[in-house]
Amino acid sequence: VQSVRALLASYPLEQRIFSRLRRQRLGADIPAFTVATAAGPSAPLVFERASGKPLTEGIPGLFTYDGYHKRFQSAAAAVTATMALEEPWVLGLERSAVDRMRDAAALGALTDRVRRVYLENYVKEWEALLADVRLVRANDLEKNIQLARNLSGGSSPLASFVRAVVRETT
């Protein structure tokens, strides 16, 4: 029991709370953000992923606008409160620590730290996707002309993609 408690205590509570939220598959019901969906049916004509991953693979729903506003905010507060109450018993803390965990200010600060962990992961997800998306490589004049037409048209996949990214990240 002591070794398990020591192992748990070695991870910050906010990390353990965020980990629990992920294990609960929070946001799994929210569609992932994908280049294919965001850029529309012409996406494969203008985009590719440097990693070779398909354009249909993207950001988990948890890390979208709806994931944050419709799932994370309320779930984070609830799971933080629950785990803060469980924490003293799980780790075998003395009574004064129990009282501190029940303090509203401490709970608010802990919720803020959980939000920070979420946002750090959010940024990593988005940076990884955006760094991986690039324009297709056109190796002849005909392909370059077609690429330019697709990019400059009224329903440009590039414009659609950028608008969708802005919508999801602001």
Where are these regions (language model features)?
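Cytosolic/nucleoplasmic, non-transmembrane interface domains of endomembrane
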Residues: 1-170
